[in-house]
Amino acid sequence: MTTKVLPQAQLISILAGERARGTRIVFTNGCFDLMHIGHTRYLQAAKSMGDLLVVGVNTDASVRSLEKAPDRPIVPETQRAEVLAALGCVDFVVLFAEPDPGRLIAAIQPDVLVKGGDWAPDTIVGRDVVEARGGVVRTIPLVPGMSTTALLQRIRSTTK
């Protein structure tokens, strides 16, 4: 069985072949720590915007550099990647170690770049790269009340 979780170099090579065949490549990224229904709906919506959905996942060190919380991520990077790869709407998963996915987006050159509705379009990392080659940037509304931070707060409040 071929894995969907690939090193960057291998993924970029595969995507070059797909692009040559006219495949529309969609890219999104995130930490995806403690997956919830908001994540799955977001990823399903992203997939509907093209043929292949590539998900960039922050490594553990990258998540810690974002200063979400000192104890994040809860779930290790290899497990977060495997959970994402198990979803039917996700075609490929790739880890990235930088605080933002700018270099990865430049290498992948997606046709569609997708982020959650909590991102202002002009602040989306990689927007300039995608639009410069004729691609589009889209945002997807968040599921109200659903976030990993809210989920963690709820868990912590019930264990006190």
Where on the chain are the PLM-derived regions?
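Nucleotidyltransferase catalytic core that binds NTPs
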Residues: 1-160
